Amino acid sequence: MAILNLAKLINPVFDSVLYTLKSHVVLKGGRASTKSSVVSIDLVNSFISDPLGNVVVLRKVGKYLRMSVYEQIRWAIYEMGLANQFHFGKSPLQITHKKTGTAFYFYGVDDPMKLKSQKIAKGYVMAVWFEELAEFAGREDIDIVEDTFIRQELPNGKEVKVYFTYNPPRNPYDWINEWVAEKAGDPTYLIHHSTYLDDKLGFLSKQMKAKIARYKETDPDYYRWMYLGEVIGLGNHVYNMNYFKPLESLPDDDKVIGISFAMDTGHQQSATACGAYGLTAKAVSYTHLTLPT
């Protein structure tokens, strides 16, 4: 078998992804950063090194599998010169190694509970890839699906490698942005950020780079979100919610000089909320919100 030179296929910024020993790898960032290509190449490279290993590739909506992750894995196989070793099945959607019988399995997670009974006849699941993670409903989707494929004990102390790829939503309070922020402190997770600026091997076309440059000039906020992968907010908040903090009691050195009440009365099944808003001598406002139980 010819030796594959991955250095020609993957930008140096992804070295930490290729060589990490952590079981979970989150790749986020802007569009055109090549992160999905990196994962597909890494998965194929690992797959051919393990004759009993299978790979599960997931998207939230099953109808998008064929023209996205299926073709992405197929692209990686062709790019690595391995196409003659595989059978590319369409129904079921599966890419099978002709010699070993192990495969890449593609599933939609329209209903996560339906995947709980999935079994793979030969070998074991060595890797799972959640593509376009921001499309998933929440962390419960991840846990239900991941638990299905990591419950089998692997030989020689191996662990299932779990990949997540996504472009961060604008909203800082979107579940995925908060989830990834939490996982940054988990020793089993590698959080990796990349952008089109990390393309040192010249994969992006001049046309693509020119388009990005125009957005950078004409719409900087959109550019930061779309191509730098920054969480810029929705742009429609009067107040920045990061400045609102829970308070156990009022400070002893700051007296309340004014208080107002407001009520949002519900109708039929809708809740009624009553708010009390205080302003102190130091021009700090405090809010107490009461909801019916």
Summary of predicted features, one role per range:
Residues L201-G266:
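ATPase catalytic-site recognition across NTP-hydrolyzing enzymes
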Residues I73-G123:
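Inter-Walker segment of RecA-like/P-loop motor cores
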Residues T287-T293:
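Conserved small/polar residues in nucleotide/adenosyl-binding loops
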Residues M1-L21:
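Pre-P-loop entry segment of helicase/translocase ATPase cores
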Residues E135-A210:
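ASCE P-loop NTPase helicase motor core
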Residues T272-Y277:
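Short beta-strand scaffold segments in enzyme catalytic cores
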Residues E131-E132:
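Walker B catalytic acidic pair
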Residues H24-K90:
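Conserved P-loop
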